[in-house]
Design a protein with these regions (language model features):
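Generic beta-sheet signal
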Residues: 23, 50, 110-112
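Surface-exposed amphipathic alpha-helices with a cationic face
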Residues: 14, 97-104
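Active-site-proximal loop->helix
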Residues: 1-39, 119-139
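Active-site/ligand-binding loops adjacent to catalytic centers
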Residues: 33, 43-44, 101-175
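Short glycine/serine/threonine-rich phosphate/pyrophosphate-binding segments
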Residues: 1, 6-10, 86-97, 176-181
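Acidic, glycine-rich active-site loops and adjacent beta-strand->loop/helix elements
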Residues: 3-7, 26-27, 87-91, 113-118, ...
Length: 181
């Protein structure tokens, strides 16, 4: 993982028994991917690239997407205008989007990325403060054909929204949720 990965993530992995190898922070996620692939090849291990492995969106085609379809069907299609999904690996938005679009075109799919790193929207990419989104490139798992629009979220606005939810509802939103608020 990049040497600047969140400390809590590193601590959690270590507690689970992982051995962590760091790639330079400046090389970002792609540097970590290269290091993981090289390490796997050198040791005869299988490298499961979460950004290019169809098992990722397939899970969301089989589980998350159908659960959302059932929920919308229960409430009525007119009750939901859009589903907003933060894009990191592209697996969730692709799997859910494909499932929803196979069922109906009446529900829009919005993909969220950091304003400061707009690879999906074709803009400039760069550093930002939203963990697990906006890697600076379009992940292989991302299916643009199921996305109706891409929304860029400013890091500061995402953090403020998370703080507001925590203060008003006493809910600590996860990293992906912060971006869709």
């Amino acid at each position: 993982m990049p040497e600047d990965a969140p400390a809590l993530r590193q601590e959690t992995l270590l507690r689970l028994g992982a051995q962590i190898r760091h790639s330079p922070a400046r090389s970002g996620v792609n540097g970590a991917r290269r290091l993981a692939a090289q390490t796997a090849a050198a040791n005869g291990w299988y490298y499961m690239d979460w950004l290019a492995n169809d098992d990722n969106p397939e899970y969301h085609r089989r589980v998350t997407g159908p659960a959302i379809v059932q929920s919308i069907a229960r409430e009525g299609k007119s009750a939901v205008d859009a589903i907003v999904i933060g894009v990191g690996s592209g697996g969730t938005v692709t799997g859910v989007g494909e499932t929803i679009k196979a069922w109906t075109n009446d529900v829009r799919i919005a993909a969220v990325e950091p304003y400061e790193s707009q690879a999906l929207g074709g803009g400039l990419t760069g550093p930002h403060g939203i963990s697990d989104l906006g890697y600076g490139f379009v992940p292989e798992n991302f299916n643009a054909y199921v996305v109706d629009n891409v929304v860029a979220v400013n890091t500061t606005d995402a953090q403020r929204a998370a703080q507001k939810v925590l203060r008003t509802l006493a809910i600590l939103p996860g990293r992906q949720i912060v971006n869709t608020l």
